């Protein structure tokens, strides 16, 4: 099987998985929160354009994770999917004079929809709430882990198929690069929840400056990571 056919099969499987979970979410969703959903959607879409290039991987990472997690925690599964899909479309929309890659857009939308729906269903699952040691913090941790796996596993698989490589080392590299950010994202989301319970969600969503700071920090960190191999090559060339 050639790479092109394998990629198309993976994208098709991802679309089917996303459609299946979205259909289930439509049945299982709880009460809607239109005003909060709109506010989270606007902030998630704005921060989705704040991207950093992942070194060693053909892809980038957006810093809107806390808003996606906020949607997972506070909104219905359907609302979380809508917020995620629209902000993902904004993130992946090509810049001026660039051509839209429909295949890539289809994969990204279905992958993010599946991951967001999975995280939302896990967070609101009755079996998780019924555990003797269950808490909102535990539910957030499990939901964040579900979102992480729902995003990174399909990405590693599609990259491996397109480049003819093993998916495991690609996923491991993605984990090393992005897992700390998921931990930070869960922490920011927990902070938003704490502020929201005392001062209201309107003030809690004012974490945009925090996300901008995280964005700048990751830009500097990854740029230094990318520069280190280049400097090593130059040193070896100079000593040759």
Regions found by a protein language model. Give the residues of each.
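Membrane-embedded alpha-helical hairpins and interfacial helices in multi-pass inner-membrane proteins
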Residues: 1-238
């Amino acid at each position: 099987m050639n790479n092109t056919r394998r990629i198309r099969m993976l994208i098709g499987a991802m679309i089917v998985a996303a459609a299946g979970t979205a259909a289930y979410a439509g049945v299982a969703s709880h009460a809607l929160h239109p005003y909060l959903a709109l506010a989270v959607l606007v902030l998630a879409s704005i921060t989705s354009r704040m991207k950093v290039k992942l070194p060693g991987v053909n892809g980038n990472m957006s810093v809107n994770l806390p808003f996606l997690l906020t949607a997972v925690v506070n909104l219905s599964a359907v609302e979380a999917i809508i917020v995620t899909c629209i902000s993902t479309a904004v993130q992946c929309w090509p810049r001026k004079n660039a051509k839209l890659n429909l295949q890539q857009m289809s994969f990204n939308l279905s992958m993010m929809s599946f991951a967001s729906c999975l995280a939302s269903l896990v967070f609101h699952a009755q079996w998780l709430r019924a555990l003797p040691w269950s808490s909102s913090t535990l539910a957030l941790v499990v939901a964040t882990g579900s979102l992480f796996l729902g995003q990174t596993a399909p990405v590693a698989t599609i990259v491996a198929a397109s480049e003819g490589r093993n998916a495991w080392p690609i996923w491991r590299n993605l984990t090393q690069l992005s897992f700390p950010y998921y931990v930070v994202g869960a922490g920011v989301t927990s902070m938003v929840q704490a502020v929201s319970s005392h001062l209201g969600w309107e003030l809690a969503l004012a974490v945009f400056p925090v996300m901008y700071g995280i964005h700048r920090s990751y830009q500097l960190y990854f740029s230094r990571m990318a520069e280190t191999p280049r400097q090593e090559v130059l040193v070896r060339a100079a000593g040759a």
